[in-house]
Amino acid sequence: MSNSKSAPQDNLFATPIANLGDWRFDEKVAEVFPDMIKRSVPGYSNIISMIGMLAGRFVTPHSQVYDLGCSLGAATLSMRRNIDVAGCKIIGVDNSPAMVERCQRHIDAYKAATPVEIIEGDILDIDINNASMVVLNFTLQFLAPDNRQRLLNRIYQGLNPGGVLVLSEKFSFQDKQIGELLFNMHHDFKRANGYSELEISQKRSMLENVMLTDPVETHKSRLHQAGFPHAEVWFQCFNFGSLLAIKGE
């Protein structure tokens, strides 16, 4: 399960690191990111595929599509493959220079009718307007909690009536027993994909101050507060999942 022919294998944490520090999406992470996320996030490839299918349903002519926290552009490419209407544009945004550089290369390698603009910047500063679809694919969890509602409010305001937000996240759980079980099953998943206990432990230590997760109930509450009348989990595997939020017509 751990072999990846399309990208270098993630062995960044295979040996002890004296001063771990906090997680950063730097050049080293960007280089191995496809292998890392495939082996670390259960259901990731399914979510990416389904985001493309959702684009085929929700993207309307002469509208804009946003991939906020686009990393290497997997969701952007999936949407572009499935958009079959005229006059659309996809805008991908990420604050990591290493991710943006590689993302642009990936976008340039696959020509398609729908134009794509990749922006290096803070998603909190991006103007969202005339949007038929917005994707936050494992991005919100890296924002300061105080900024999360503000971003969702701006997304809601920038969406056209009937537009959709896809919000994928790692979840925490109010039920501690369920939370512990799914946490442990996720670690089983990573072990089955070839990660050692050292790799799992070091990565977790680097992420614990940077990636702050919320329960599904909190996500739904924020989405409803932003104005979305419809919000529900459409995909979940262990403690990873994705919600759909649809703006009223």
Swiss-Prot record:
Where does the chain bind S-adenosyl-L-methionine?
A: 44, 69-71, 94-95, 122-123, 137, 204
One Pfam family of this chain: Methyltransf_25
Q: Which branch of life, at top level?
A: Bacteria
Membrane-spanning residues: none
| GO BP | tRNA wobble uridine modification
| Enzyme Commission number(s) of this protein | 2.1.3.-
Tell me what reaction this enzyme catalyses.
prephenate + S-adenosyl-L-methionine = carboxy-S-adenosyl-L-methionine + 3-phenylpyruvate + H2O
What are the recorded GO MF terms, alphabetically? carboxyl- or carbamoyltransferase activity; S-adenosyl-L-methionine binding
Keyword field: S-adenosyl-L-methionine, Transferase
User: What CDD domains does its record include?
Assistant: AdoMet_MTases (cd02440)
Could you tell me what this protein does?
Answer: Catalyzes the conversion of S-adenosyl-L-methionine (SAM) to carboxy-S-adenosyl-L-methionine (Cx-SAM).
Quaternary arrangement and interactors, per the entry?
Homodimer.
**Family under the similarity heading:** Belongs to the class I-like SAM-binding methyltransferase superfamily. Cx-SAM synthase family.
Name of the protein: Carboxy-S-adenosyl-L-methionine synthase
Organism of this sequence: Proteus mirabilis (strain HI4320)
Q: Which gene encodes it?
A: cmoA
